[in-house]
């Protein structure tokens, strides 16, 4: 695979959005260097740090120390960990913490954690004072390569995932790759699903590279940094071209229409299914459905499933512990998805590995028939 970024120990990816452009820094030691990096970019010297009970014991103290060394005064709020934290119940305390810290125009809110903390904190920053500065310090692989980049923020609803939120771009993303060393194997695998997604969207050579080098990515070191940097560059390019998801950005949702429905069907119970696992199953289903519609070869679907299964990800509905609702109930969840326009189902389908496209008129009857075959119970 041809490298898409400079061959240095620390990588920098620029998200080009005119006056709202920002940097993504990728490499080890960035939490300890956060104060210096933030102080060099922002004039404000007051910060509110939002994190969760899993991340705080490891990284809150080093972050607060780094901020203090750079003359930044910070307060912190520690929330429960897990997908259910993305709710109105926890949004209000975050907003109050930001206001209580007297965060002003040049100050910032810092999200220290995975995708849940980033999405929730970004939403709060987007609505407090009609928009506060916001810094992402993602500590999970999924957050580093996906949710921390691009400005999508939000919380879940009883009607579905991420249905309440705003676009609010961060001012800086610090992806400390050393933080990934403390992830559980399951968490890392879940994030890897989003890495593989970029290859499946439009970078077949990257997917092939992952097939050959995934063990090195899991082990850490240069291959891991390379995979994260390529993923961030891929997302940055898409976001720069289509920030508000009016066209090309929708491709980033490959696997997510099925995946979000499965997350809702399991009541966001992380013991049964986490987001990246839902995406993995969703990407296999998207390739299988594309083959069913005679858009792609069944061999491509088998290849995608084989790779995701090799790294230890679930790839079939039967891999999800416990009972799932019937196919018609899954269809109801799909119909609530944000990728529905004019009552017509919009899916990201594929013509082959790295040849994904937006299909905005998918017959619901075909999807229901497909799901019934895959999940006859």
From Swiss-Prot:
It is an enzyme of class 4 (lyase). Pathway: Metabolic intermediate biosynthesis; chorismate biosynthesis; chorismate from D-erythrose 4-phosphate and phosphoenolpyruvate: step 2/7. Zn(2+) binds at residues 194, 256, 275. GO terms for cellular component: cytoplasm. The keyword Lyase applies. GO terms for molecular function: 3-dehydroquinate synthase activity; metal ion binding; nucleotide binding. Its main location: cytoplasm. Catalyzes the conversion of 3-deoxy-D-arabino-heptulosonate 7-phosphate (DAHP) to dehydroquinate (DHQ). This is 3-dehydroquinate synthase. It comes from Rhizobium meliloti (strain 1021) (Ensifer meliloti).
């Amino acid at each position: 695979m041809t490298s898409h970024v400079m061959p240095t120990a620390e990588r920098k990816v620029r998200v080009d959005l005119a006056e709202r452009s920002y940097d993504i820094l990728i490499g080890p030691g960035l939490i300890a260097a956060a104060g210096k990096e933030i102080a060099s970019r922002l004039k404000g010297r007051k910060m509110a740090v939002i994190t969760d009970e899993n991340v705080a014991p490891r990284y809150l103290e080093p972050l607060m120390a780094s901020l203090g060394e750079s003359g930044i005064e910070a307060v912190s709020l520690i929330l429960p960990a897990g997908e259910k934290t993305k709710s109105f119940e926890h949004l209000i305390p975050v907003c109050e913490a930001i206001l209580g810290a007297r965060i002003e125009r040049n100050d910032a809110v810092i999200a220290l954690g995975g995708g849940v903390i980033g999405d929730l904190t970004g939403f709060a920053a987007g609505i407090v004072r009609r928009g506060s500065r916001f810094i992402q310090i993602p500590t999970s692989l999924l957050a580093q390569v996906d949710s921390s980049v691009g400005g999508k923020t939000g919380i879940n609803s009883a009607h579905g995932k991420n249905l309440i939120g705003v676009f609010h771009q961060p001012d800086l993303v610090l992806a400390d790759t050393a933080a990934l060393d403390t992830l559980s194997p399951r968490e890392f695998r879940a994030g890897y699903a989003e890495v593989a997604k970029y290859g499946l969207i439009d970078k077949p050579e990257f997917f092939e590279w992952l097939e050959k080098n995934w063990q090195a990515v899991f082990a850490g070191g240069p291959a891991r940094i390379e995979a994260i940097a390529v993923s961030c560059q891929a997302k940055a390019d898409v976001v720069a071209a289509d920030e508000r998801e009016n066209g090309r950005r929708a491709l980033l949702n490959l696997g997510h229409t099925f995946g979000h429905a499965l997350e809702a069907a399991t009541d966001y119970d992380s013991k049964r299914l986490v987001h990246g696992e839902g995406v993995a199953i969703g990407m296999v289903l998207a390739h299988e459905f594309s083959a069913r519609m005679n858009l792609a070869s069944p061999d491509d679907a088998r290849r995608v499933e084989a790779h995701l299964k090799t790294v230890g990800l679930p790839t079939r509905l039967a891999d999800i512990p416990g009972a799932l609702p019937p196919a018609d109930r899954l269809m109801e969840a799909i119909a609530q998805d944000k990728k529905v326009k004019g009552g017509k189902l919009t899916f990201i389908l594929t013509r082959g590995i790295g040849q994904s496209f937006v299909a905005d008129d998918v017959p619901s009857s075909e999807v229901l028939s497909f799901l019934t075959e895959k999940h006859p119970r």
